Structure formats: C-alpha cells, structure tokens
C-alpha cells in the first residue's frame, strides 16, 4: 500500500484525488496535452510517466495494472499501441510541464502538461552545441577511425605485395619466352 503524500489532497479526500488524477491521465493520453493548475500538473506527471513505462513493456500484466487506473479501454489501447512504442527509445521524461498565464477568474497558477513528441537529442545536435559529451564522443570517433585506417593500410600493403610478386614472375617468363623465340 503506497503511503499517502503529505499535505493537501488537491481539495478533497485521498480517493477523490486518486480519481481526479486518473481522469487527468485519461485526458492527457487521449488529447496529448491538457491545461490544468500547476499543482495538479505536478501531481499528474509521476503517474503519467509510470503508466507510459508500463505501456512500453506491453504485456498483459502491465495492461491490467494500467486498467486499474485508466478505465477507458480505448485510451488504454491508444496508450499501448501508439504512445508506448513511440517512447520505446526514451528512458523517462515523457511529459513536459509549461507554465501558462494565471486563470482569469481566480488567478490560479495554470500549466500545460503535454506528451513529448520530439526525439531525444542526437549526437549531431550535441556536436553543434559543443558540449563536453560531444567532445568525448568526437575523440572516440576519431580514435576508431584512426584504427580503421591503420587496418585498411596494412591489408592494402599486404595485397600490394602479393600482387607485385606475380607481376615480376610474369615479366621474367615473358623475357624467357622472347629469348627462346630469338634463338
């Protein structure tokens, strides 16, 4: 049994909070992004990330675990068929919270929580930024290229030596044949 978080329950009992977060997660997976209060968005993020991680595994047990939270079968199907495979190469960080302007009626802090659709940062992007990670990767790449060039040079020189020897033998045979013809 998970221990409840300390502090306010987002304006209700623990069961109300649990159901409200389930509804927010359902809307997030259905629409891709939702606008809600900052507090709700911060409470929703760990739940959504956990559900996406279970969807990435994709087995029956995890599908049933997700069905405990999200009651809509269509949303669960979308989560396992589209969203989970989309994040297959990403280890966490599936959602993004962006602060928005306060709500007009009560001036509550608002935020937009959305699923991240961009791919992770590639090596080319790191190289363009000139980060330490990119420099380390560049040094490793240069070292492997140098080793590859050395191995190709040694194989080329070995092949060249083996092709030169028959050429010299062929010249010797040609001169011997010419001498026989002259005599």
Curated annotation (Swiss-Prot):
Acidic residues: compositionally biased ranges: 151-162
InterPro entries (alphabetical): Ribosomal_bL17 (IPR000456), Ribosomal_bL17_CS (IPR047859), Ribosomal_bL17_sf (IPR036373)
Stretch list, region Disordered: 130-183
Gene Ontology biological process: translation
Pfam families: Ribosomal_L17
Presence of keyword Nucleotide-binding: no
A GO cellular component entry from the record: cytosolic large ribosomal subunit
Keyword Disulfide bond included in the entry's annotation: no
Gene Ontology molecular function, alphabetical: structural constituent of ribosome
Keywords, comma-separated and alphabetical: Ribonucleoprotein, Ribosomal protein
UniProt xrefs under PANTHER family: LARGE RIBOSOMAL SUBUNIT PROTEIN BL17M, RIBOSOMAL PROTEIN L17
Stated family: Belongs to the bacterial ribosomal protein bL17 family.
Protein name (record): Large ribosomal subunit protein bL17
The species this protein was found in: Saccharopolyspora erythraea (strain ATCC 11635 / DSM 40517 / JCM 4748 / NBRC 13426 / NCIMB 8594 / NRRL 2338)
